[in-house]
UniProtKB/Swiss-Prot annotation:
InterPro entries: LCN-type_CS_alpha_beta_dom, Scorpion_toxin-like_sf, Scorpion_toxinL, Scorpion_toxinL/defensin. The modification Cysteine amide is found at C82. Has the structural arrangement of an alpha-helix connected to antiparallel beta-sheets by disulfide bonds (CS-alpha/beta). GO terms for molecular function: sodium channel inhibitor activity; toxin activity. Pfam families: Toxin_3. One of its GO terms (cellular component) is extracellular region. Belongs to the long (4 C-C) scorpion toxin superfamily. Sodium channel inhibitor family. Beta subfamily. This is Toxin To8. Keywords: Amidation, Disulfide bond, Ion channel impairing toxin, Neurotoxin, Secreted, Signal, Toxin, Voltage-gated sodium channel impairing toxin. The keyword Metal-binding does not apply. Disulfide bonds join C31-C82, C35-C57, C43-C63, C47-C65.
């Protein structure tokens, strides 16, 4: 029983360490990266260029990426700078 509990604990610990983030790619002006008029595989390519595992054009509007390294800045509603003057 002790080994089973230890195994489960290690399993959850590994899951937390390997976890990567996901979200919308950040464009040059602080907005989500637009994909409306881009080729079909544009978002998949852009996500792989920043180290993401996969990506797609969400609702034909913005690139959404999965398993992006922690060092990559993604668009966040809390820190949204899109359309704001500096």
């Amino acid at each position: 029983m002790t080994r089973f509990v230890l195994f489960i604990s290690c399993f959850f610990l590994i899951g937390m360490v390997v976890e990567c983030k996901e979200g919308y790619l950040l464009g040059s002006r602080g907005c989500k990266m637009n994909c409306l008029t881009r080729p079909e595989k544009f978002c998949e390519l852009e996500c792989s260029l920043v180290g993401g595992e996969n990506g797609y054009c969400a609702y034909w509007l913005a690139c959404y990426c999965y398993n992006v390294p922690e060092s990559v800045k993604l668009w966040e509603s809390d820190t949204n700078e899109c359309g704001k003057r500096k």
